[in-house]
Amino acid sequence: MTVLGATGKTGRHVVAQAVERGWVVRAAGRRAAGAGEFVAFDWDDESTWHPAFAGADAAYVVIPFNHAGAPEKAPDVIRAAAAAGVARIALLSTIDVDHAPDDDPTKVAEQTLLSLPVEAALIRPTWFLDNFTVGSFRGMLDTGELRLPAGEAPFPFVDTRDIAAVAVAALAPDGPTGPLPVTGPESVTHHAVAEALEAALGRPFRYIPVPAAEFIALLESRGFTHSYGDFLADALGKVANGSFVIPVADTVERHCGRRAYTPAEFARHFAQS
């Protein structure tokens, strides 16, 4: 199988879990991953696309939205995978893609995949717990204060290891296809996430609800753009006011034979690693 984004948040776990199954894994990208066989893949160089997929039975596709031009090229990459003979393709999507406009790149990528003569799995995760440790909010972990405009509403955050587990299940012969929502085992508040990390790391960490303007200014002070801060503040605000509610899904339990990881289990794993 071929894995795009093999060094990323989900891709590295897909590679590791597929290797654990004894599969031959091509870790495709511009640099070698921690496991798997490296194969060159560059979103800006179409000559690398076919060789990365040729001979693979399955592929995991991640769209790097921070790579200029990649979202627009995603349909062509997916078509290239199918043209190379890949029979099963799992696309990393998002939990709320059905509510996105028709020209949304993720929605277009999903529709492209579904139009092809392949077994298609749409991996639709909710927000990553990993965003608190290696993502946009990592700086807040270092200061001991998670300052977000998210109010007190609960949310079913997911561990990226669970996203990978569902993807690997979908890439197996006779694996599940179609939309696969991936959430944590329960909805929890940001207070609960902070408490889990505090307990695992053995140092103070608390959640403090703040106004959107303060949050945006905080992100700007750490090098993020105003537009990115405004985008996150809008999403968090919808959680706070109850207009963005995600039900807990049992996808991990149904297809992986175990329940999804809790925030406490995620935090302990992060602390140990």
Which role fits each region the language model picked out?
Residues 1-27, 31, 44-50, 54-56, ...:
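Oxidoreductase cofactor-interface core, primarily capturing Rossmann-like NAD(P)-dependent enzymes
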Residues 213-273:
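A hydrophobic C-terminal alpha-helical subdomain
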Residues 35-44:
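Active-site regions of enzymes building and remodeling cell-envelope glycoconjugates
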Residues 34, 189, 262:
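Short phosphate-engaging motifs
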